[in-house]
């Protein structure tokens, strides 16, 4: 069933119809389209287009259709309707006859689809927020269980300073908290209803759009009809949030892929999230993490694609906007799947503490401590930095860690070095001294875990 046709004397070419139709992807808006139609039927009563009895009949039929869709959503794709709006209206007419043809009075598919998509976005943001917080909780739990797992921290993929696995987990909690905040901010801006804006100039019926927005669960109604039907900022914002969120998950995956290598050996992944090789029987591949990392690109592509689609569009609605859905659906589905998978990876991870500690003791990760020790003895930091660099070169030459160089050797680089230097060079001392807010000291990590637990509830 087409919602237009009187203007045309020829039928659409089937090739054009296939090119133009959107039901194959906008079927996902079925529930939102039906909910929006129920609200619109109520609004039509207030302006005398429908009687209360007619509205009740329409609402009952729409609610039955809603249950049918929830029970068997695949039925929608069996239709040759142009889009989800055509499908819903056609099914409604099948149920109530001519009365169904009155529902679209004063409404355009332009404000209808804008409303449907915003309702879908609100529902999906709620799912994303739940999944995000579940992953944050999984990271906090992993941090709680690994506060004593000392490991090397890296810059430039070179061992830099000792940290703990707990501190590493909490770094990703911070990233995910920002992702959560971005979603909440986006939700505030998309929580305005475009329904009642018509094709572009507004509806000719004196409908209370604020009341209509409230029936649909929106905070308010939009203020300008031209903007309302052409606005896709919420699509861009959610795609941007997804793109940033997927970058965080990709970095998380890359870290764990490295930690899981034979060369690092800091963690072992569960059999539940790894796979084997068809040729090499010894292999245990981190496929879940590699797929998270790999899927990041498609989400970035969806954001870029939508930016390019919108950049040259004049006001108001253009068919180009039909391209807003496939990329958005795929990007948010992908992000949601990856959030769930990241939590599953953490659920079975094993941290190999002895190997982590062994690696932390290598690479002269305590060199900064020696520099700070010299500063405490009155040596200017830049001079101390140079002195320690020379000491590291000598330690490398001898094949020893700094703490195994004899005092006489260390004093060749600076006479202020005394026996009290050796406790300073221990891993525990390296951690304990990082006691400022946000640092890796046990006290700060414990406080960060407690703060995250309280915030997540």
Swiss-Prot record:
Family to which this protein belongs: Belongs to the lyase 1 family. Argininosuccinate lyase subfamily.
Protein's name in the database: Argininosuccinate lyase
Gene coding for it: argH
SUPFAM superfamilies: L-aspartase-like
Catalysed reaction equations from the record: 2-(N(omega)-L-arginino)succinate = fumarate + L-arginine
Entry-linked Pfam families: ASL_C2, Lyase_1
Keyword Iron-sulfur in annotation: no
Keyword DNA-binding: no
Locations listed in the record: Cytoplasm
């Amino acid at each position: 069933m087409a919602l237009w046709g009187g203007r045309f004397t020829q039928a659409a070419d089937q090739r054009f119809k296939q090119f133009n139709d959107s039901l194959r992807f906008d079927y996902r808006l079925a529930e939102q389209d039906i909910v929006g139609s129920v609200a619109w039927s109520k609004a039509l009563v207030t302006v005398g287009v429908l009687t209360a009895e007619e509205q009740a009949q329409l609402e009952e039929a729409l609610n039955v259709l809603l249950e049918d869709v929830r029970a068997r959503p695949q039925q929608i794709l069996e239709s040759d309707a142009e889009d989800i709006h055509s499908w819903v209206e056609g099914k409604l007419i099948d149920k109530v006859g001519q009365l169904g043809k009155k529902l679209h009075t004063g409404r355009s598919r332009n404000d209808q689809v804008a409303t449907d998509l915003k309702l879908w976005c609100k529902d999906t943001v709620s799912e994303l927020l739940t999944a995000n917080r579940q992953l944050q909780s999984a990271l906090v739990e992993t941090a709680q269980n690994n506060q004593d797992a000392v490991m090397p921290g890296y810059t430039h993929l070179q061992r830099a300073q000792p940290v703990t696995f707990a501190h590493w987990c909490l770094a990703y909690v911070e990233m995910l908290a920002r992702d959560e905040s971005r979603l909440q901010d986006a939700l505030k801006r998309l929580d305005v209803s475009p329904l009642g804006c018509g094709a572009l100039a507004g509806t000719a019926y004196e409908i209370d759009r604020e009341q209509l927005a409230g029936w649909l669960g929106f905070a308010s109604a939009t203020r300008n009809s031209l903007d309302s039907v052409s606005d896709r900022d919420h699509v861009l914002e959610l795609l941007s949030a997804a793109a940033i969120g997927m970058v965080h998950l990709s970095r998380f995956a890359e870290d764990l892929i490295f930690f899981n290598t034979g060369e690092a050996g800091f963690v072992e992944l569960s059999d539940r999230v790894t796979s084997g090789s068809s040729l090499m029987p010894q292999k245990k591949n981190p496929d879940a993490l590699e797929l998270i990392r790999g899927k990041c690109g498609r989400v970035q592509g969806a954001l870029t694609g939508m930016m390019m689609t919108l950049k040259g569009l004049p006001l108001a609605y253009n068919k180009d906007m039909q391209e807003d859905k496939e990329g958005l659906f795929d990007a948010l589905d992908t992000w949601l799947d990856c959030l769930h998978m990241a939590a599953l990876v953490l659920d079975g991870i094993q941290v190999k503490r002895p190997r982590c500690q062994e690696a932390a003791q290598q690479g002269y990760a305590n060199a900064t401590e020696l520099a700070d020790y010299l500063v405490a003895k009155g040596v200017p930091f830049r001079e101390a930095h140079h002195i320690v660099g020379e000491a590291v070169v000598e330690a490398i030459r001898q094949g020893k860690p700094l703490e195994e160089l004899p005092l006489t050797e260390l004093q060749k680089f600076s006479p202020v070095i005394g026996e009290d230097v050796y406790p300073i060079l221990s891993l525990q001392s390296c951690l304990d001294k990082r006691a400022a807010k946000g640092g890796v000291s046990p006290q700060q990590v414990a406080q960060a875990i407690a703060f995250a637990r309280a915030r997540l509830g």
